[in-house]
Regions:
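Flexible, compositionally biased loop and terminal segments
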Residues: 1-117
Length: 117
């Protein structure tokens, strides 16, 4: 299923969807810190981000959490700092295009400030 989906969308350029399988943000952060420490580079956001598993992927603008659970579950803790987070009651298999479009519409109405007041 994943290979088929990847092949069908390999030429798409407008939207990027990432699935994180067997991923844990705490482990990613710890490993990135260890690598940065061993590199002797200055500890700053840019240097740190270069050691994350997701270094070549843009930070998400939207996080959709399905399953009527209001937690992040150790998912992209660094990367979602400025993402808009939507919690959905539906389970992932039941989440459909109508649900997705509703979230996109809501997202477009949000004035994002990226941490500024």
């Amino acid at each position: 299923l994943l290979v088929s989906s990847e092949n069908k969308t390999k030429n798409n350029k407008k939207l990027q969807i990432n699935l994180a399988l067997n991923y844990g943000s705490k482990t990613e952060l710890l490993n990135a810190f260890k690598k940065l420490k061993n590199s002797k580079k200055i500890l700053n956001e840019d240097n740190f981000k270069n050691y994350l598993q997701t270094r070549d992927i843009p930070d998400p603008d939207i996080l959709i959490r399905t399953g009527n659970t209001r937690r992040l579950s150790n998912f992209l803790l660094w990367q979602i700092a400025y993402a808009e987070i939507f919690f959905e009651k539906k389970l992932w298999p039941d989440f459909n295009e109508k649900d997705y479009n509703r979230i996109i519409k809501k997202f477009k109405s949000i004035k994002r400030n990226f941490g500024n007041i």
